[in-house]
Regions:
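An N-terminal assembly and electron-transfer interface module characteristic of large anaerobic redox
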Residues: 1-372
Length: 372
């Protein structure tokens, strides 16, 4: 019962993370469900669906299809749909139903590949994990598939190009995250590639993924991109760094105001781990400037999602549910919480300082929605 939610809405599941990465790939995404998971993704977890085009299909599994595992019928539907749209690839996405009946998605991928002339990938989402696990596996599948298909020749390295890993609406809470990323990084790098989306030299989708061999640096802006960054470092010797250049100026300003009177108590930052660490580093540097660095050990990062050991500091915490979160806040002497506003629901007894830092995967709110 640790994951029982009484005050919060369900967090975005892994299949939503998969679709979020595939959304801008210029392909055709097939969600293996009866329609409910697709409706949840398009209606709640993928805000671009309302304003941008992406070919997302439900497999439309009926009871007997699920029970009997009518793979041939599903493959025929995928092939027929692929002939009706101009897609660069096909992504087959698992959900709860195929996970329960042990559908072999790799077999579906192979069967489909034999009948179409475009690349096919499959991602084993189960609906039981969170969005960042789905994103992580999708990035890995895309790199494994398209870099391998591109051959094993020694890649031609460029001098000053950067790739972005882990940038989705679910992690950034922004509808358009490429424009501010380009603005932030364009002064330092000649070209900025956002994997799974676009670049400033006209490349998009698969072509951006293939470009991953050639960049001089990767920037990981959420934990979902860390595994792929390590893979690219190991296979192609591309260095990576972690950081989050998209934080609102308002948050920095509110932190500055709070620190003027800050004397004791913990500061709890709850978000995806890379963003939360960025906020913590900012606070630590401010305290160091003011010669109050003895307070730096009071800053704690908490998350409901991935908590990587190499990015973790002593005291950081993975909340397994809202009960653990509420108990932690009740037990600790906390002077400031920086988190999505929805997280105030389980801690109605908390009356101290709070700074809103929107997390779409938790509340379904975008940054501009929250501040309007």
């Amino acid at each position: 019962m640790k994951k029982l939610l009484k005050y919060l809405s369900p967090f975005a599941p892994d299949q939503s993370g998969v679709v979020s990465v595939l959304f801008g790939m210029g392909g055709m995404t097939v969600i293996c469900d009866a329609g409910g998971c697709t409706g949840n993704i398009c209606g709640f977890d993928e805000p671009r669906w309302a304003t941008q085009k992406s070919a997302i299909f439900s497999a439309g599994l009926r009871d007997m299809d699920a029970i009997l595992g009518s793979d041939d019928k599903l493959v025929a539907k995928i092939v027929k749909a692929s002939h009706q749209i101009d897609a660069d690839m096909i992504g087959i996405v698992g959900t709860v139903v195929p996970a329960v009946i042990a559908t072999d998605l790799r077999a579906l991928k192979i069967m489909t590949s034999k009948k179409v002339d475009i690349p096919v990938v499959s991602i084993e989402a189960t609906g039981t994990k969170y969005y960042d696990d789905g994103e992580e596996e999708t990035y890995m599948e895309l790199f494994r598939t398209f870099l391998k298909a591109d051959g094993d020749m020694e890649p031609e390295k460029t001098e000053n190009e950067i790739g972005i890993l882990g940038a989705t609406c679910l992690d950034t809470s922004l509808l358009d995250f490429y424009t501010p990323l380009k603005k932030s990084l364009g002064q330092e790098y000649d070209k900025v590639y956002c994997y799974g989306l676009e670049s400033d030299d006209g490349l998009s989708g698969i072509d951006v993924i293939k470009r991953a061999k050639n960049v001089s640096m990767n920037l990981v802006i959420s934990p979902a991109g860390l595994k792929s960054a390590k893979y690219l470092k190991r296979k192609y010797n591309i260095p990576y760094k972690l950081g989050y250049p998209l934080l609102e100026k308002r948050i920095y300003d509110e932190i500055d105001d709070f620190l003027k009177g800050y004397e004791k108590g913990k500061i709890l930052i709850i978000h995806q781990q890379v963003l939360a660490n960025e906020v913590r580093n900012y606070i630590k540097n401010k305290l160091l400037e003011e010669k109050r660095d003895f307070l730096a050990d009071n800053i704690v990062v908490g998350t409901f999602f991935q908590l990587h050991k190499e990015l973790k500091e002593e005291g950081d915490i993975l909340f397994k549910g809202e009960d653990e979160f509420r108990e932690y806040v009740d037990k600790e002497d906390i002077s400031l919480i920086i988190a999505d506003k929805l997280l105030l629901r389980p801690i109605r007894g908390y009356k101290k300082a709070f700074i809103e830092c929107t997390h779409f995967a938790i509340s379904g709110k975008l940054v501009n929605d929250s501040n309007s």
